[in-house]
């Protein structure tokens, strides 16, 4: 029996509609329109597509967007100076620096320069730390989007065994914190994990984000598990696939996210929610 598909596109549209309604309500209440500043350095085609998608979502939600497209040759000092200006700009509620940055730039230093209350990606150590101590302020977009999907499909992590494959600062680590917050029993697997297949086989909820096509084999999946595939990989033939071997996994899982159309749309919807939240922080 094939797994039920978790439709991130459908859930994200509902979330975007809710943001649009909240923005319209703010305007009726004479509160300022939320504003997102997006910074793109260099000409990476995939990054340009992501930035364009974010601007389109802003338009759908009634959120103002400012775009800063900088040349590949931009120095660390120039980029930090722009972040400093945006930090003190009262019109700007959220700042997003599109990753990856060119190799000569220090991404971590740039992310740490963003004011935590404008860090709508949720990458600043302050925001990750608040999540770790159960006091979230700005929650990282992809992990929060995953939790929204679980909620939308009536999946309560409480008491479940959750396994996160991948320990990146962007997905794996904050995802584990989100699942802990939801009272799951959480295991994090990484490059030094032994017997990965055995760890995966014990998961009631499996979240995979390693950036390697078909890394998790379908036969590893516990029958009846919920599988959330965060990976998005472009193959040589131009098609997209996730980090989980989808065709075999869907014959064992109860629910599974497709790639594309699963987690990806939720990341952008959460970014819009975080920008709205940032605006509310700046109302006072």
UniProtKB/Swiss-Prot annotation:
**Molecular function as annotated in GO:** methenyltetrahydrofolate cyclohydrolase activity; methylenetetrahydrofolate dehydrogenase (NADP+) activity
Q: Which residues bind NADP(+)?
A: 166-168, 191, 232
Instruction: Quote the EC number.
Output: 1.5.1.5, 3.5.4.9
Q: Which GO terms describe its cellular component?
A: cytosol
Q: Name one GO biological process term.
A: L-histidine biosynthetic process
Query: Where does this protein act, in terms of pathway?
Result: One-carbon metabolism; tetrahydrofolate interconversion
Which InterPro entries does the protein's record reference? Aminoacid_DH-like_N_sf (IPR046346), NAD(P)-bd_dom_sf (IPR036291), THF_DH/CycHdrlase (IPR000672), THF_DH/CycHdrlase_cat_dom (IPR020630), THF_DH/CycHdrlase_CS (IPR020867), THF_DH/CycHdrlase_NAD-bd_dom (IPR020631)
- Catalytic activity as recorded in UniProt: (6R)-5,10-methylene-5,6,7,8-tetrahydrofolate + NADP(+) = (6R)-5,10-methenyltetrahydrofolate + NADPH; (6R)-5,10-methenyltetrahydrofolate + H2O = (6R)-10-formyltetrahydrofolate + H(+)
* Keywords, comma-separated and alphabetical: Amino-acid biosynthesis, Histidine biosynthesis, Hydrolase, Methionine biosynthesis, Multifunctional enzyme, NADP, One-carbon metabolism, Oxidoreductase, Purine biosynthesis
| UniProt function note | Catalyzes the oxidation of 5,10-methylenetetrahydrofolate to 5,10-methenyltetrahydrofolate and then the hydrolysis of 5,10-methenyltetrahydrofolate to 10-formyltetrahydrofolate.
HAMAP family named in the record: THF_DHG_CYH
Task: Give the quaternary structure.
Answer: Homodimer.
The similarity annotation says: Belongs to the tetrahydrofolate dehydrogenase/cyclohydrolase family.
Q: What is this protein called?
A: Bifunctional protein FolD
Q: Which gene encodes it?
A: folD
